[in-house]
Regions:
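Metalloprotease/metallohydrolase-associated module, dominated by Zn2+-dependent proteases
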Residues: 37-107, 154-225
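Extended assembly-interface/linker segments at domain junctions
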Residues: 112-117, 125
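Active-site alpha-helix of zinc metalloproteases
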Residues: 120-124, 133
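Catalytic Zn2+-binding segment of zinc metalloproteases
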Residues: 130-148
């Protein structure tokens, strides 16, 4: 009765391949006139939580169900998704050098939760997995503010690039910036330790600790640490 939280399932990173880039032909003319507005802020699109309850036959689990840990018969799968698009303006100094200023960032966030329980499972097991769901949703409550804070540190940032193909190098740089933003979001979100502590408090659902109390204690103790 353990939630599975390896990073490959806990946090899935999605970076939009087509980052927002203003027209290369316009960069040379407009960059000298345009400066990023001081009040420019990143755009955060936080999607509602997508939740599903799935029941399975232990003798024939569905192909899309993550493997159960040894000794466990149910699990809560939480996927925190993030993708970022980054746009900028370039000021070209010569044929192989330019300065790119980041002027636009949009981050889209999503949380998908699936609780997997076997047919005929007890209510106690279901309640334990619901506790894992509550922990994930607690972290997602402030995910928008976290993403905004991280993205804001990149707004207006100027990056020097050197290449024979400045357009391609600019695209590569903006894509890397998008990756950096989502990587930092994933690192700081980090609900894993709280999920592990919740399992420790409840002995993976084997004891009689009230789920609500266990969730609160796990969140509080991790926050103190």
């Amino acid at each position: 009765m353990e939630a599975l939280f390896p990073l490959r399932r806990l946090i899935l990173l999605c970076v939009l391949p087509g980052v927002l880039i203003f027209g290369w032909l316009k960069w040379r003319d407009l960059s000298a006139q345009r400066q990023p507005r001081e009040d420019s802020v990143p755009t955060i699109n936080k999607q509602p939580v997508a939740f599903a309850n799935r029941t399975f036959d232990p003798a024939a689990p569905p192909a899309d169900m993550p493997p159960l840990a040894s000794g466990e018969n149910a699990e809560c799968e939480s996927n925190f998704l993030s993708n970022a698009s980054v746009g900028g303006e370039s000021r070209q100094s010569d044929a192989t050098h330019a300065t790119v200023t980041i002027t636009h960032i949009k981050v889209t966030l999503q949380l998908n939760i699936t609780i997997w329980v076997p047919t005929g499972v007890t209510q106690h097991v279901i309640e334990h997995e619901e506790g894992h769901r509550q922990v994930s949703e607690f972290y997602y409550q402030t995910a928008g503010k976290l993403a905004e804070r991280i993205a804001a540190t990149y707004m207006g940032k100027q990056i020097e690039i050197t290449a024979t193909d400045l357009g391609a190098e600019s695209t590569k740089m903006l894509q890397q910036t998008a990756t950096d933003i989502t990587d930092e979001y994933n690192k700081e979100l980090n609900p894993g330790p709280t999920q592990l502590l919740y399992d420790a408090i409840t002995d993976h659902g084997r004891n009689e600790v009230v789920v609500r109390d266990a969730v609160a204690a796990a969140i509080e103790n991790i926050a103190i640490e």
